[in-house]
Amino acid sequence: MAEGGFGADSVGRGGEKASVTRGGRWDLGSSDDESSTSTTSTDMDDLPEERKPLTGKSVKTSYIYDVPTVPTSKPWHLMHDNSLYATPRFPPRPLIRHPSEKGSIFASRLSATDDDSGDYAPMDRFAFQSPRVCGRPPLPPPNHPPPATRPADASMGDVGWADLQGLKRTPKGFLKTSTKGGSLKARGRDVGDRLRDGGFAFSPRGVKSAIGQNIKSWLGIGESSATAVPVTTQLMVPVHLIRTPVTVDYRNVYLLYLEGVMGVGKSTLVNAVCGILPQERVTSFPEPMVYWTRAFTDCYKEISHLMKSGKAGDPLTSAKIYSCQNKFSLPFRTNATAILRMMQPWNVGGGSGRGTHWCVFDRHLLSPAVVFPLMHLKHGRLSFDHFFQLLSIFRATEGDVVAILTLSSAESLRRVRARGRKNDGTVEQNYIRELAWAYHAVYCSWIMLQYITVEQMVQLCVQTTNIPEICFRSVRLAHKEETLKNLHEQSMLPMITGVLDPVRHHPVVIELCFCFFTELRKLQFIVADADKFHDDVCGLWTEIYRQILSNPAIKPRAINWPALESQSKAVNHLEETCRV
């Protein structure tokens, strides 16, 4: 065979050739009567002690694997032989540490696990229940004495299994019943239990009230027939909103957003429109008050406090207002994202001819992202940095119709006082006037965008051009110079120009202004004077309806109507369920 093959010359008799050319690790041709110098002996008796098997009979083999025949460590069930792992107590109770002990409860649980005794501790160490049916003991008798480690005040501790007998389910949660007075025997037993538990337990509501409550409970004097246990209300989680809709039915829908100062009648008009129009052709989105007041923090209460005690030029006040305005804007941004997912962006004003549908919103993202920050900026409560960060989150959709409702400041203040909201006490007439000015400034800026381009608006903000020069270069605007000057003075551009003067050379500022005016131009504004329609909601809606249908620039959008109705029902159900 050729060189490098497996011929007769390549491997000699008895492995001599292999031992000369290459010292193989496994010498399969070696024998007892041959003296080979290439491999190690495979006899089990000649192995060192550390390479012999740990147990079992030694067997001669040609291969040696360095793998022990028994495990090198103890099995899990031998390391953890505590009976707690076998049958946990049911039901679990919280672990109560002595005040003198240091360290966390988790550390105490770990130290308790190392105990080798098979007896249970007075309390369960792990808050889990046995999966076996037989692991649940029967209920204790009614007169069963409570454990010695029970909290002194039942309202301050967790509800155990023995305490569930005295609970009943109500619409407000679980209520723990307690009889007024009671028999002498029952009162004596309760006194003994509390003395055995260590006397009085002071609650964090104050020493004086705690002493009174503990004395009454020690004497067995009942104050009320039921003590409320706070339980979180179980609400439906609307995960169906993010799934692919089963029914797809695109309709022509007008997206109408009602805007204006507080007390102008936005919520009243939303409810009236849902009653005036046919139910199958209208849906609505209320003001997200539940998210503002109950999700994590109450930003509505916080902003009311800042209007009362906030200081102009204070960085802390500006940071708090920025945080509140961000939370105000989040529900509008999520709604806009959901609606954009249901929309056919290429279909404007066409599609199905089954009639026009309406979707009415209480406020637009324009309010928390532009109008209110502009008012706070004017009064110095919001810094320049925070103002432009809020301005950057503003987004709009082609076809959004913003109806600004106007009303006198005196009438608006009277309505605010009449509705009696808890956090509206800081609203004054001057505050309503400043807010109306902010709406008017944004509206004038939008009107300017109907005459000049977005690039020219940005150039006005960074002071690279002016109104006379723009009108001089355009034949169409030759006779509009005075109109544009008046609009420019009443718009938000003078304030933005003053803020951007030190940083107008920065590309970020240029791009920010360009994006903002591009989004603002997508909107369609109409103005309705609510002063002409006192106590006439139908007349006010007729005026808005007429302006929308007579404006050729306002067109409906093709939206999946079943998905939009499902989104609206989920939002309305949450507002009706959680609002007090």
Swiss-Prot record:
Top-level taxon of origin: Viruses
Cellular compartments per GO CC: viral tegument
Keyword Repeat in record: no
UniProt xrefs under Gene3D superfamilies: P-loop containing nucleotide triphosphate hydrolases
List of residues binding substrate: 325, 421
GO molecular function, one term: thymidine kinase activity
Signal peptide: none
Binding locations of ATP: 260-267, 415
Entries under SUPFAM superfamilies matching the protein: P-loop containing nucleoside triphosphate hydrolases
Pro residues: bias regions: 137-149
Active site residues according to the UniProt entry: 287 (proton acceptor)
A Gene Ontology BP annotation from the UniProt entry: TMP biosynthetic process
Enzyme class, first EC level, given as a word: transferase
EC number: 2.7.1.21
Residue numbers spanned by region Disordered: 1-60, 133-157
InterPro entries: Herpes_TK (IPR001889), Herpes_TK_C (IPR013672), P-loop_NTPase (IPR027417)
Keyword Endoplasmic reticulum among record annotations: no
Catalytic activity: thymidine + ATP = dTMP + ADP + H(+)
Homology family: Belongs to the herpesviridae thymidine kinase family.
Subunit: Homodimer.
Known function: Catalyzes the transfer of the gamma-phospho group of ATP to thymidine to generate dTMP in the salvage pathway of pyrimidine synthesis. The dTMP serves as a substrate for DNA polymerase during viral DNA replication. Allows the virus to be reactivated and to grow in non-proliferative cells lacking a high concentration of phosphorylated nucleic acid precursors.
Protein name: Thymidine kinase
Organism for this UniProt entry: Human herpesvirus 8 type P (isolate GK18) (HHV-8)
Gene, per the UniProt record: TK
